[in-house]
């Protein structure tokens, strides 16, 4: 006989945990199904371990690039990759403990194992059947590996976090967040790093000002950027090294190859066909604005929904809003996917909210868009030989010059933009920005002093 719940969340990542906890807080009988470590991609092989590695890279840059001009004679005896990994994993372990504690306090039933649908109201885990009035699919995605000869000799972005030793020479293939971040970390920590992108630049969906500045810094400081580089074949040499051959005839010999070319939805292993839930050709689940699929009682949040934003806070927010609607009598609760702030932990970091210049002109008309920009050298680097640019932009629309896009790249931009996101969600105009007294000397003051 099947065990019945009010709510079953398939996937113990950020979205599933957030939704399960919120539903349980309102008295729902909830099951959370996860086969691996709680926290999903973000906590285990994504945002969290990546940010720890990035902090390590920042410390390396401080010592190697900037300390001397601040008067410090730093004698770096070496870098212990294994120690950083040990510290990183200990931190992740504490997050796992926190999840266990909070889920336990909320009386969420955590079921370990892989879930498969039996029908639209029933799932099977380890041979046991569970039913629910409401079922959330939040299984996330997996890294994609290209279909070329020798691709198996490389590792994916998840495998980067399994590296027990620091590689001496690395090729990172990809043009998105993950590729740029991994390449930046490895380069800063001392690995000879090559970043290969298919087109003319990485991060092509970002505002051109951001892209141009990032490429400028890469050209000056590294990692080595290879544009118009399409992988053709990977050959494993007799000495164990790998040679990446490109369609343009060029090649690069490295010790490690990391594929970071994107992700695909992990919907192929849950027997979704038994439910009738609609997906697109790539396996992404189709949902409406309330996270509902075409099958009553089945919902979806996170990286596997069609047209979604693949960011942890988005999945968390969407999962919580869904539980508010289902279990807290808030029929209109839903995720607002407009003006979502995002950061790339590159070198230097990038922050962006809203529309690029081109997107704003397409939406509002070129004559109704005004752009303000600022460029300077961050004070932190300005007193050193390794000066690094900082660029900022406001994209404004309409007679009132509502701020519809905010973009920045430079020292500490990652910590600047959260508050501006609040202002933009409230409909802030350029005049509102101008009315704020600047904090001096900071980089963030540029956002409220542009002319």
Which stretches of residues belong to each language-model region?
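Glycine-rich flavin
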Residues: 2-5, 21-28, 33-166, 199-203, ...
